[in-house]
Design a protein with these regions (language model features):
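Short Gly/Thr/Asp-enriched flexible loops that form oxyanion-binding sites at enzyme active sites
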Residues: 22-33, 65-68, 130-132, 249, ...
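Glycine-rich, acidic loop regions that bind phosphate or pyrophosphate groups
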Residues: 1-7, 43, 84-193, 380-384
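Glycine-rich phosphate/diphosphate-binding loops that line cofactor/substrate pockets in enzymes
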Residues: 7-12, 37-51, 71, 112-114, ...
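Active-site diphosphate/adenylate-binding microenvironment
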Residues: 193-280
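Thiamine diphosphate
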Residues: 103, 112-114, 151-153, 159-161, ...
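Conformationally flexible catalytic loops at phosphate/diphosphate-handling active centers
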Residues: 34-47, 204, 210, 419-420
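N-terminal beta-alpha lobe that positions the nucleotide/phosphoryl donor
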Residues: 1-43
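Glycine-rich, anion-gripping cofactor-binding loops and their flanking helix/strand elements
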Residues: 57-141, 254-286, 300-303, 334, ...
Length: 424
């Protein structure tokens, strides 16, 4: 049917740009939430003395960040980023942003009022608000575009199904209809000041820690600090690190500024370098940085370097090479007999040690190994100059392991050669 309609046009070629952007095939999915449920949710939020908002990836998918920011600002709600999100779903240097849910204990020490209402907006995956809500008898408002996720992992007081942008806008209008600007100001003034003071101190402390970090191996905090200092204001960061809060804590993201892509909501590995090529293809006039862990890069990603080199894809690839799978190490060392015995036979990635700069050189991509804090800023600057010349660049950043079991180098010794009965 669609092809027949194109043939009927006098100038079918005029539709081709629209087809390329899929506008001609776009079906509106903007489902408006139930107004009765909106009113119930608005009352819960308005009556709360210490609310909390958790934000997830559906906010970015629905282009709803400005509306969600307006909602949070209206009631001075502290905002925590869901740990499994593809983007940064709320400006992470905003005065109301307190980090991830794991930062909540430090926030509550600063503002010692028990959370009495939660709104989880645009979230689907586990390991979020449902963990926080365990054993708490407080109202939970869950807003999502997916009806199968609402109330699935935690009982909800209000379920809001619909487009996230419309949900946020309707909540704002409902709250404004229930309270005057003066009333809202009186209810939120103290909390707004407390949250902004906490957030400012947290960001200042994080940046200062990054600035002052030094040594060999390279502290990852220093790397991210210098990257934040040197990147373009509208750069795109495609990140595939074990812990996304590193990136969100140290690099400034916002709808009008830098864009964060990754990690996937399923926490998959092996996609980031190829995704950075696609990102540069889609956004050729924006600086693109691919942030990788050594473990993730070893999930078969070197072939993307071939594409970068052949087609002159100017992407700066930075591999945080600490010779370890940190995610598995944290889990193993955090619980169980192996952790109690200080043994981890899974996570160590040395022997042989990987040299990713040499690997890049096989594809005619320039690069370097950075192991000391004094080397990192000049290396990033060289990388960005190479990007301006139209070529990719590789930085193999030899970063320090940290946390429990950081110094472990155990692995199970095994040799296929020793299995042979004859030397063939």
């Amino acid at each position: 049917y669609f092809v027949e309609e194109i043939i009927k046009l006098e100038k079918p070629d005029a539709l081709l740009p629209t087809m390329g952007g899929q506008t001609a095939l776009n079906v509106s999915m903007e489902l408006r939430p139930d107004p009765v449920e909106i009113e119930r949710a608005a009352k819960f939020l308005l009556e709360s003395n210490s609310p909390l908002m958790e934000v997830g990836f559906e906010i970015s998918q629905c282009n709803a960040i400005p509306s969600v920011v307006e909602l949070a600002e209206l009631l001075a709600i502290p905002v925590a980023q869901h740990s499994r999100s593809f983007h940064c779903d709320f400006p992470n240097y905003h005065p109301l942003h307190i980090g991830y849910l794991l930062n909540l204990p430090s926030y509550m020490q600063f503002y010692p009022h028990d959370i009495d209402c939660c709104i989880s907006i645009g979230t689907r995956a586990t390991q979020g608000m449902e963990t926080f809500m365990k054993n708490r008898r407080i109202p939970l408002i869950h807003a999502s575009v997916d009806p199968e996720k609402i109330g699935r992992n935690a009982p909800t007081a209000v379920g809001l199904l619909g487009d996230i942008d419309l949900i946020a806008k309707d909540l704002v209008e409902a709250i404004k209809s229930m309270a005057s600007p003066a009333q809202l100001k009186r209810r939120t003034a103290e909390r707004r000041l407390k949250i902004s003071t906490y957030s400012a101190g947290k960001h200042a402390g994080t940046r200062e820690a990054g600035r002052l970090s030094k040594g060999d191996p390279l502290p990852w905090q220093k790397l991210l600090y210098e990257l934040d200092e040197l990147m373009d204001p509208d750069a795109v960061v495609v990140e595939e690190l074990g812990r996304g809060e590193r990136t969100v804590s140290h690099i400034n993201f916002s709808p009008e500024g830098r864009l964060k892509i990754g990690r996937t909501t399923g926490m998959a590995l092996g996609w980031g370098v190829g995704a950075s090529v696609g990102t540069k293809l889609a956004l050729p006039d924006r600086q693109v940085v691919s942030l990788q862990g050594d473990g993730g890069f070893m999930f078969g990603q070197s072939d993307s370097l071939w594409s970068m080199s052949r087609y002159d894809v100017p992407v700066l690839t930075i591999i945080l090479n600490n010779r370890s799978y940190e995610a598995t190490r944290f889990r193993i060392m955090g619980a169980g007999a192996a952790g109690e015995a200080n043994r981890d036979y899974v996570s160590f990635l040395g022997d042989p040690d990987m040299d990713f700069a040499k690997l890049a050189s096989v594809y005619n991509i320039p690069g370097e190994v950075v192991s000391n804090s004094d080397q990192v800023r000049p290396a990033i600057q060289r990388g960005f100059r190479t990007l301006k010349d139209g070529r990719p660049y590789m930085i193999d950043a030899r970063t320090a392991s940290w946390g429990t079991g950081a110094g472990l180098t155990q692995y199970q010794k095994f040799s296929v050669a020793d299995l042979r009965s004859r030397k063939v």
